[in-house]
Amino acid sequence: MKNWIMTALVALTGCGGGSTPTDHAPATLLEPRQSAARAQILADSASGFVCAPEAVTCVEVSSTASSAQATAPITFGQPFRSGDLPTGTALHAQDSTGAVPLQVDGVSTREDGSVRLALLSAQLRNLQPGEKRLLQVFAGPAPGGSMPATSYTVPSEGLSVQATVYKPQLSQVVFGNRNGHTPGTPFQDGEVITLTLTMGEVTETHSVTVTGNLVGGAFTSLTQIAWAFHNQINARANGLFKAIKEGESYETLGLTTREPGRGPFTVNLQTNSASPIRVDSLKAFAAPQLYQATATEQRAALQAAIEQNLKPHLVGAVAREHTLVLPLRNAQGQAHPQLAARVHTRLLDGGARVRHDLVMENAWAYNPEPGNLTYSLQARLGNQLVLDQAPFTHYHHARWHRVLWQGPEVKAVVRHHMPYAMASGVIWQYNLDLKIAERTLAEEATRLAAANTGLMQSGFLTPYFGTTGGRHEIGPYPRWTALYLITQDDRARASMMTHADLVGGVPIHYRDAVTDQPLDLDRHPGVTVRVATSAPADALPAMSDSGTLWSPDIAHQGSFTFVPYVLTGDVYHLDELMFWAAWNMNGYNPGYRGLGLGLLHPEQVRGQAWAMRALGEAARALPDAHPMKRYFETRLANNFAWYNDTYKVGGPVSPLGALVNPYQDDTIGPWQNDFFGLVVAQLAQDGYAQARPIFNWVSQFNVGRFMHEADAGYCVAKAPAYYVKVVKTVDGKRVPIDNWREVFQTNWPGVTCDANLPLDPSSYPGSSLGYAANARAMLAASANAGHPDALAVYRMWVARTPGIDNAFLTDPTWAVTPLRH
C-alpha cells in the first residue's frame, strides 16, 4: 500500500381531503436539496473559526499539553459533502507553519463514487502549550510533492496482559411459584423467611417478615421479597456475602461472596410459609487461575501484522495501526474460552511512541462456557504497571477498553468545522445558533462526575431500555452528543465519549471466532440472540450466569457510537457500530426476518426506525475495504427493497403514507412515523437511491398531516398527536382510510380547525423531548432530503411551537434544523 506524507491519495480498494389513493403517490422521486457553494459554508464561523475559501475543509487543533510538543501526530475522522472529493483525488494539508504531512485511510464512498468519510492523520510540528492551530485540507497534490514512506520499528518493550480469573460460587434463591402473570401460592402477612449463609465457621443469618407489599404470590410481591433480602445482605458491615439483583431478575436473588476467591458456602432456609422457596446452584466454586498474554507474544504479533499487513486500520507515513488479537492462556497453555484481549496498536513517529487501545472482550458467540466472568487485570509495558483493575464482574457478551501510551502521549484535541461536517449529510444538521449556557455545560460535568461510570455501569443511560417516557439517549443522537456537536466543549465531549464506552457493557456483543467479526447471517442464518429459538445448526451454547444490569431492546435504542467514530476514527467505536447493527438483526425469530436477509420490519415502528439508523450507520461508516462493508450494505439494501415493495400504490397499506404498526395495525403513532421518516431522510440525503421511494412514501403522512388544514380540515394543532386511527371497517373488512378529512374526523369527531384550537397536549408542545419537537426534527430532515414542502412546513411549525426553542437551550437532543446554507 502506497504511503503518502505531504500528499495523501484517496485510494479505494474493494472491499388533501377526498382524493383517491393514487393522488398520494409522488409523481417523481424527490431529489436532495441543492447545496450551497463550498466556500460559503467554509466561511461560516459557527464553530469559532473559518476555513480557507479554496480548502475542502479544515479543523482546529488545540494543544492540551503544559509544554511544547516537537511533533503532534493526530488522527481524526472527516465527513465530506457529496461530490467534494471524487475517488482518487489527492489531498494535502497546511497550517500556519507551512506544509503538514498528511495520510488518508478508512475511506467510505457513496454511490456516486465520491468520498463520504475518511480518516485523516496529520503530523503537526512544534505545537506550543495551549496553542490553537488551524489545519487546512486541500484537494490536489502538495506543491512540494510526496515524501517517502516511514519505516516503523516494533518497540523493544512489549505489552503484557495478566488476568486472574475467579470462579466464585453463585447460588440463586427463587421465591414463590407464580406462573407468568398468574400468582402462585401467596406469602401471608406475618410469615417469616430466614436465610442462613455459612462459610467454614462463619455464619450470617438474614430474616424478612412478610408484610405490606411483600404479601401475595404475584411477581410484584415476590420481587419485593427478593429485594428485601438483597438490601439486608448488602447492608451488613464487614459481611462475607453479596446479594445480586440485576436486570429482569424479579423473584430471584443471586448469592455469592464479596471477595471472589474466598471459597464455597452453604445456603439454608427456614420459613413458616406454605409458598415454596428453592435454592439453585448456578456455579460451583473453583480456585482462581492466572491467564496471560506475554509481551513477547504481543511484539511478535505486531511484527507479523506490519510485515504481512494484517488487520490494518491506518497505514501511512504519519501513523500505522493494526489490530492484534491476543489469547489469554493459563499455565498449561490453554486459552480462556471467552476472555480475550484485542489491542489496536498505533505506531507514531516511526514507533518511538505507541498508542495501545486495549480492549477486553467476553464476547465469543460459539465458544464454550459463555457467561459473566469475575477477574482482576494488570497490564504492563515492559516492567511498568500501566493498568491495575481490581476484581469485578465482566458481563457476558460485553467489552471495555482503556487507552495506554508507550512513550509521550500526544496531547491535542481536534475540533471540526461543524457547518461543513453537518452540510455533508453524514451527521444531522443541528442548530448551531443555539446558545448553550455555561451553566448547562457545567452541570453536565458535575452530573458526570457523580454518576456511576465504572466498568459495566450505566452512567446517564437507562439500563432497562423499555422504560417509558422521553430520556436523554433517545433521539437522532443522545443529548450529550447533540451538546457536543453544537458547542464542541470538552465537558460535553467527555460525556459523549464516556457513554460511548459504557455501552460496551451492554450484553449485545457476539463475535464469531471463525471470522473474528460480529456474528453474521451469512454464516448463521438461523441464529437468534434475543427471542425465540435458533435453528439447531446455529444454536448458541447455553449460559449458566447471565444476569446483568441491562435489559436492552431496539425500540428505545440510542445512537451511541456513530459520532464518536466519525470524529475520532477509533476502531473500538467502529466495532461497536457493527455489534449493535448486527444484534438488532440477529435478535429476531429467523423466520420473521427472512433468515439471512436481516429484515427489520417485525419490530414496532420506532424500533424499525432506530434499527435502520444503526444499520445505516454501520454501512456508511465502514471503510470500503473492510471485510464487513458489503455485508451491512447488503442488509441495508434488503430492507430498502422490502419497504419499497411493501409501501407502494395498490398495496394493502395506508395510501396516506402511514406505516403499519405490527402490534396494532389500525393505528399509528405519528411520532413513530416521524422517527422512521427522520432516519430514511438522512439515508436519502447521504446518497442512498434506494432510500428515496420509502422516504417519499412516509413523507406523505409525515409532512402531509401538517398541510391539509385548509383543504381537508386536518387541523395542524392535532398533527403531532400520540396515536391516530388510520384503518376503518367496510363490509366487515378492515381497509385503510384514504383521505385526510376522514382520518381527522375518525379521530376527532366534530372538531373544526380555528386559530384558537390549542396544540394537542399529548404532543408536549413546550418540551424539548415531546412529539412536537420530534416533528420539528423530522420536518427539517425531510427538507434536507429534498421534500419540496418540508422547509415551509418546518418554519410554520417552529412559529407554532415557540416554547421548544427555550427548551432546546438545555436539551438540544431534537434540535435538528434545515441546512444552514
Regions found by a protein language model. Name each.
Residues 98-104, 202-207, 384-390:
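Surface-exposed loop/edge segments in extracytoplasmic proteins
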Residues 131-141, 263-277, 335-337, 371, ...:
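Extended Gly/Ser/Thr-rich low-complexity repeat segments
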Residues 178-268:
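Extended, beta-strand-rich, solvent-exposed assembly scaffolds of outer structural proteins
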Residues 145-150, 169-187:
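Disulfide-bonded cysteine-rich modules in secreted/extracellular proteins
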Residues 2-8:
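Sec-dependent signal peptide recognition
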Residues 10-38:
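Bacterial Sec-dependent N-terminal signal peptides
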Residues 37-167, 290, 294-298, 302, ...:
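Alpha-mannosidase-like glycoside hydrolase catalytic domains involved in N-glycan trimming
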Residues 298-299, 303-821:
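Catalytic cores of extracellular degradative/oxidative enzymes
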